[in-house]
């Protein structure tokens, strides 16, 4: 057993059906509608935390947002968000998984589920909670009991063959983000090839190409999030 920084126990090696069932309910125990929860996963260094930061900056003036980060043994991602002041400190909570990242977002969601519920209690009502996974491989996916939709972030520096390789993260995420497009000429990645391969793997599921070197770079992802929020509120 490991613990989150706030002392929340995280039991490894088995699933939790009950929390997943509770989380899937769109209403809180008091009858109010809970926040939309969107998970962000992807390999180490693909730009997940930078994407979370950019989304917070883009959406925070119109929406009530909170973030849960996941790291194996540190608070590094949460500390990055705090240092860059993308949200007030009370709206950012870190979970130290102590195990493979996918364990905490798929196999045993108890610590993350408690973190999102604590945030709703502390700073709610919230419109949106972003749950960032620790860096993982192409098979990483979120439990449907933890998030309502998931974004999978890859980057061109990892190779333009990643969409073709597939894996559940690439093929099933509600949105695939191909990040760091500004680096494509320097690493020999063919963006058109990546788009075609992603289309073959994902069918009609959307793909966004981003470069976060400017504030406008997160625009396609922010637009997708706004559409999810509109559907959630309908």
Swiss-Prot record:
Q: Which InterPro entries match?
A: CobW/HypB/UreG_nucleotide-bd, P-loop_NTPase, UreG
Keywords per UniProt: Chaperone, Cytoplasm, GTP-binding, Nickel insertion, Nucleotide-binding
Coiled-coil positions: none
Recorded GO cellular component terms are: cytoplasm
Task: State its location(s).
Answer: Cytoplasm
Instruction: Name the GO terms of the biological process aspect.
Output: urea catabolic process
Entry's Gene Ontology molecular function annotations: GTP binding; GTPase activity; nickel cation binding
For GTP, which residues are the binding ones? 42-49
For the region Disordered, give the residue spans: 1-29
Q: What does this protein do?
A: Facilitates the functional incorporation of the urease nickel metallocenter. This process requires GTP hydrolysis, probably effectuated by UreG.
Quaternary structure annotation from Swiss-Prot or TrEMBL: Homodimer. UreD, UreF and UreG form a complex that acts as a GTP-hydrolysis-dependent molecular chaperone, activating the urease apoprotein by helping to assemble the nickel containing metallocenter of UreC. The UreE protein probably delivers the nickel.
Q: Which family does it belong to?
A: Belongs to the SIMIBI class G3E GTPase family. UreG subfamily.
Report what the protein is called: Urease accessory protein UreG 1
Organism in which the protein naturally occurs = Streptomyces griseus subsp. griseus (strain JCM 4626 / CBS 651.72 / NBRC 13350 / KCC S-0626 / ISP 5235)
